């Protein structure tokens, strides 16, 4: 029986997981510099020990409501093909081991962009663990400056 290790976190009450191998570290909320005209999901840029990292708000990216005022996100720093990126999440979970045999297709109840960014699901004893497509989550759509000209997304 083959197993995978996933680092888990929650966003809007949903449990998500990403492969442990892509997670560099998990840190408390970091002050951010906003990027003018950036897509809503691009929360800003953070300074991680002198390295500038793009922060993607998973609530916005997945189409969930905004966080309550005063509620700070946590940063899950992941390695992608574009370098390090911070995923802003509500809460950090544990590292769990899941049997590959329990992997299922994404639930039919997922709608919109969330359905496109979920690779599948694992049924745990206490919850449904949604496997996030990390690269898809950080690949933001290009900007349209209103004149019909597409502007490159800052990354």
What are these regions (language model features)?
Residues 1-155:
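An acidic, low-aromatic, low-complexity terminal/linker signal
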């Amino acid at each position: 029986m083959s197993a995978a290790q996933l680092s888990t976190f929650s966003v809007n009450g949903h449990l998500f997981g990403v492969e442990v191998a892509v997670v560099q570290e998990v840190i408390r909320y970091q002050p951010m510099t906003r990027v003018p005209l950036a897509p809503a999901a691009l929360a800003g840029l953070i300074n991680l020990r002198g390295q500038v990292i793009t922060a993607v708000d998973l609530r916005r990216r997945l189409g969930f409501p905004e966080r309550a005022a005063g509620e700070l996100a946590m940063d899950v720093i992941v390695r992608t093909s574009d370098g390090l990126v911070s995923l802003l999440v509500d809460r950090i979970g544990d590292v769990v081991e899941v049997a590959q045999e329990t992997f299922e297709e994404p639930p039919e109840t997922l709608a919109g962009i969330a359905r496109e960014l979920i690779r599948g699901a694992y049924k745990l004893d206490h919850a449904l663990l949604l496997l996030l497509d990390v690269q898809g989550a950080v690949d933001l759509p290009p900007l349209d400056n209103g004149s019909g000209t597409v502007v490159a997304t800052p990354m």
